UniProtKB/Swiss-Prot annotation:
Catalytic activity reported: guanosine(46) in tRNA + S-adenosyl-L-methionine = N(7)-methylguanosine(46) in tRNA + S-adenosyl-L-homocysteine
Family in the record: Belongs to the class I-like SAM-binding methyltransferase superfamily. TrmB family.
Its EC number(s): 2.1.1.33
PANTHER family found in the cross-reference section: 3-DEOXY-D-MANNO-OCTULOSONIC-ACID TRANSFERASE/TRNA GUANINE-N 7 - -METHYLTRANSFERASE, PENTACOTRIPEPTIDE-REPEAT REGION OF PRORP DOMAIN-CONTAINING PROTEIN
Binding, substrate: 128, 160
Top EC group: transferase
Record's protein name: tRNA (guanine-N(7)-)-methyltransferase
This protein's UniProt keywords: Methyltransferase, S-adenosyl-L-methionine, Transferase, tRNA processing
PROSITE patterns cross-referenced by the UniProt entry: SAM_MT_TRMB
């Protein structure tokens, strides 16, 4: 379903102190931009920001980068993140929000940026064969992530889609990642501290089991 236009979104984003208008300027300089050496966690496709809002507001010792492409969802993410920080009486000093085509993620991140963890939550499964290269877990994407993901850095991947999950396992293996953890039923697993996204809640209410894995970049 296409999201309705939100004329307020772009002006709000441009006036937001944690929205990065031109992220390409900071390629190789994200630690300098944050102003500290805290580890960097990256969410690819942050949607309405409910996942990022919880993680970033509860973990001040980690720097977070949240990426999506459309102003409409980024505007909602901005509001949700602000609300979470306000509830904890915290400044939004460890989170950056930006618009970027994820297929071109190397435009804004390089090996100097040293990302410790990547979150990929309920990305588009692109089921047609001719579209599979667009998947955020496809080999082509994983090779990009490897350039800025640190040695033994991790990718946390959640999906409702069985085919995407199984084929992603193959992608991770082919790209030289090691599967550190895997479950085909996240909500009945031993995983602690899971933060649900809006899609995750919706699929769970429909009785769909959530698949989850942690893939680690080997040395």
């Amino acid at each position: 379903m296409r999201m309705r236009k939100k004329p307020w979104a772009r002006p709000e984003l441009e006036g937001c102190d944690f929205f990065v208008i031109n992220p390409k300027e900071y390629k190789g300089k994200w630690k300098e931009f944050f102003g500290n050496d805290k580890p960097i966690y990256l969410e690819l496709g942050c949607g309405k920001g409910t996942f990022m809002a919880v993680h970033a507001s509860e973990n001040p010792d980690i720097n977070y980068i949240a990426i999506d492409i459309k102003d409409e969802v980024l505007g909602l993410a901005k509001r949700n993140i602000e609300k979470a920080y306000e509830e904890k009486n915290r400044k939004t000093d460890n989170v950056k929000l930006m618009a970027q085509e994820i297929g071109l993620i190397s435009e804004i991140l390089s090996e100097e940026d040293v990302v410790s963890r990547i979150y990929i939550n309920f990305c588009n499964p692109w089921p047609k064969e001719k579209h599979k290269k667009r998947r955020l877990t496809h080999m082509r994407q994983l090779e990009q992530y490897k350039t800025f993901l640190k040695s033994e850095g991790e990718i946390y991947f959640k999906t409702d889609d069985d085919e995407l999950f199984e084929e992603s396992l193959e992608y991770f293996n082919e790209a030289g990642f090691r599967i550190k953890y895997i479950t085909y039923d996240l909500h009945n697993s031993d995983v602690e501290g899971n933060v649900q996204t809006e899609h995750e809640k919706m699929f769970s209410e429909q009785g769909i089991k959530i698949k989850f894995l942690i893939a680690m970049k080997d040395n």
